[in-house]
Amino acid sequence: MVPVIALVGRPNVGKSTLFNRLTKSRDAIVAEYAGLTRDRQYGEARWQGRTYIVIDTGGISGDEEGIDAKMAEQSLQAIEEADAVLFLVDSRAGMTAADQMIAEHLRKRNKRSFLIANKVDTIDPDLARAEFSPLGLGDALPIAAAHGRGINHMLQEALGIFPKDNVEEEGEGEPASEEVAEGEEPTRIPGPSEKDGIKIAIIGRPNVGKSTLVNRMLGEERVIVYDQAGTTRDSIYIPFERNEEKYTLIDTAGVRRRGKIFEAVEKFSVVKTLQAIQDANVVIFVMDAREGVVEHDLNLLGFVLETGRALVIALNKWDGMEAAERDYVKTELERRLLFVDFADIHFISALHGTGVGHLYKSVQESFRSAVTRWPTSRLTSILEDAVQVHQPPMVNGRRIKLRYAHLGGANPPLIVIHGNQVDAVPKAYTRYLEKTYRRVLKLVGTPIRIEYKGGENPYEGKKNSLTARQVNKKRRLMSHHKKAEKKKKDKRR
């Protein structure tokens, strides 16, 4: 499971700066959930092939009232959700009473914590270590978040306590280890899902019908193999079979009785949701058709898109809507979900089972699209046809040239295109290529990523050397030029 690391500390010690440094300010996957987690930000980060989730919290000063007390409460909740805590202190300001209070709380919770002395760019790191040693959390790790100093050592220490089972491997967004032979048919890249079947995460806002859908999918007509508790918090991994196909449901809403079709008010956990997305092969995103698309839905869909997971969208509670309401919702979906237009959309009633069975076909197609690989000849042929129909634009009087393409990875498919001036390819042309590959390869339910690589200039940095013929020509020209200059001088005399 993907580790979760919380950044805590009093206000203005550099938590947000460190958060942006770790997540590389990837705004598309950083979400603020109004009302639910108004003072926590969640972001995905990667370091040396390892993926982890970072929580940025509000500051704790110890004398909070009103909304500040809510901020402190959110920070303490983040500590409970996290697997490890990075406790930031300000080296310039020195140790404060608030620092001592936070350290005491961490010791009581027996939470794996790392003391991080920030802003050491103008202070001796040894002095910072000595200053904060009374906190009783071990030696402080000195960093300067604003300049990136000490970050690698800090991550080495913090991530070193976790097993390396979340390092990205083949079939999980990394390049495939072997090329598809020319003329070979497209094949699936085997992944961890072969044993437990396709891993499906059912996610969505609270009270959209996730629990009802889980119970419907695990109904009595299905063969449930066994129930196995997840390794992190309350997520439950439930392997089951349907039509002799294996699946594993990742249920973030906790254990519930089979056959109890009731959607209680859930306690929404962002961490469990993000971890389920990371661990899944396919995400079924559930929305309430009566409420339409809200901002929170877009935030979660953005995270799914950034992680590259295959996606199926389910509009629940469709059965009780009037025709005019349905038309309006469909119009809104077309307008607001353009960025995930590759995903199948199903209109279902989890309570009555209407349309639920059709989800499995989309899950299968999405997974197959995400893990299929194609030979270089096939991808290059599609590229050549696309360029012939619509050529890349001119840059500085020269046409961008795209020469060949090959598969760089799967889940999601990564297509690497080689050519000249590729750094100038417009985003609109990249979208055109994505749609072309999606149409020709008949890809459904998975994002596509295109990466460009330019050819190296073999003469870059080298001085041109003239041939013997060019040297003789240069001599003749220089001789002719000198004679002409001499004649001009003679005439002036």
UniProtKB/Swiss-Prot annotation:
Binding residues for GTP 1: 9-16, 56-60, 118-121
Keywords from the named record: GTP-binding, Nucleotide-binding, Repeat, Ribosome biogenesis
GO BP: ribosome biogenesis
Entries under Pfam families matching the protein: KH_dom-like, MMR_HSR1
Biased composition (Basic and acidic residues): 454-463
Compositionally biased spans, kind Acidic residues: 167-184
Protein name (record): GTPase Der
Organism listed in the record: Pseudomonas aeruginosa (strain LESB58)
